[in-house]
Regions:
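Intrinsic-disorder-linked linear interaction elements in eukaryotic regulatory proteins
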Residues: 1-340
Length: 340
């Protein structure tokens, strides 16, 4: 076990568990005072940074019987829960106070700025979140160094903030650094290393670096331990291959995922039908019209028999439209018109 992995466990820092597709985002490692960015729900409220002076930085809330007694004796109605804007304002006040008392390069200030950036991200204030995470990372590097676990957490938060703000190229730069460090410390097959490689592949694909994306998807597929995550990676790989015109390779990946999901979930499951639909579209893109018709028709029939789920019903409509298009491409106009 590496030094930093041991320290992560001793200090309570750990990789947060979250299931996501290869096209979506994953949480940063968690520690008690350092929060995750937007849309990485952990179920933990924003913590206040530990005060250097020993005095609380925010008023403590009454709980349980004490809170009830306070309401009874005062006769005042219980105040409504604070809004996101109120929480952000409180975090802004906390940060200003810490900057004035301790300066910007103090651990408490760094924690407070990270928490404020997190709240901005949760509120959808993406640009403000990015700006605060950038400042937090610069301060963390100056105080803790590049390789400190807390710096890594903040760097991952910034990478996620860049992704949320539609800046995949900037996010890729952060994931590259995280991947190098995790590979050095933990090895290529470690769960967090694979996660960083997957996110790097996603960002490369979204920023148009398709060959690099394919390389990292393929490596992540080799290293990942989970069957479900391997399927997600294959879907991401197939998307990168399709975008680069490698339709036959994309079809091969989709066929493997479809076979696996049929075994695990059944052919009528939404996740299975979604891949079935993608396979039919891949055949259409490859100019294999007859096979596209066969695959899309099969998926459409299965969806019709599994349409109790509203999501399946919506997918059924898309399948019907794409099947009609495949019939047209194959010169089968009468069958296409019957679906329109």
């Amino acid at each position: 076990m590496s030094f930093w992995r041991a320290l992560l466990r001793e200090t309570g820092l750990k990789g947060a568990t979250r299931t996501r597709s290869a096209d979506t985002t994953v949480p940063a490692r968690a520690e008690q005072p350092v929060e995750k960015p937007a849309e990485r729900p952990t179920g933990v409220s924003v913590p206040s940074p530990a005060p250097a002076s020993g005095a609380p930085t925010e008023p403590l809330a009454l709980t349980g019987a004490r809170e009830e007694a306070a309401r009874t004796t005062s006769g005042v109605a219980h105040a409504p829960a604070p809004t996101a804007g109120m929480r952000a304002a409180s975090l802004e006040r906390t940060l200003r106070s810490l900057v004035e008392r301790l300066g910007t390069e103090h651990p408490d200030t760094i924690t407070a700025r990270n928490n404020l950036a997190t709240k901005y991200a949760q509120m959808g204030r993406r640009q403000a979140a990015v700006q605060q995470f950038e400042l937090t990372l610069a301060e963390a590097v100056a105080v803790f160094g590049e390789e400190h676990p807390r710096t890594e957490i903040i760097r991952e938060n910034l990478a996620w903030a860049y992704e949320d703000a539609g800046r995949p190229a900037d996010a890729a730069g952060q994931w590259e650094m995280l991947l190098r460090e995790r590979e050095r410390q933990f090895g290529s097959a470690d769960e967090d290393t694979v996660e960083a490689r997957m996110r790097l592949a996603v960002c490369y694909r979204r920023s148009g670096r398709l060959d690099a994306a394919v390389v990292h998807y393929e490596r992540a597929i080799e290293d990942v331990a989970s069957t479900e995550r391997r399927e997600e990676l294959r879907l991401g790989l197939s998307a990168a291959q399709s975008m680069s015109g490698r339709y036959e390779d994309a079809i091969g990946q989709l066929r493997m995922v479809l076979a696996g999901r049929r075994r695990r979930l059944g052919k009528g499951h939404l996740d299975t039908l979604t891949v079935h639909h993608r396979l039919g579209r891949a055949y259409t893109q490859a100019g294999r019209s007859d096979e596209a018709v066969e695959v899309l028709r099969d998926a459409y029939r299965v969806a019709l028999n599994s349409s109790g789920d509203p999501e399946v019903r919506r997918l059924t409509l898309r399948l019907r439209r794409d099947l009609a298009g495949a019939y047209n491409a194959a010169g089968r106009y009468r069958e296409a018109n019957a679906l329109l």
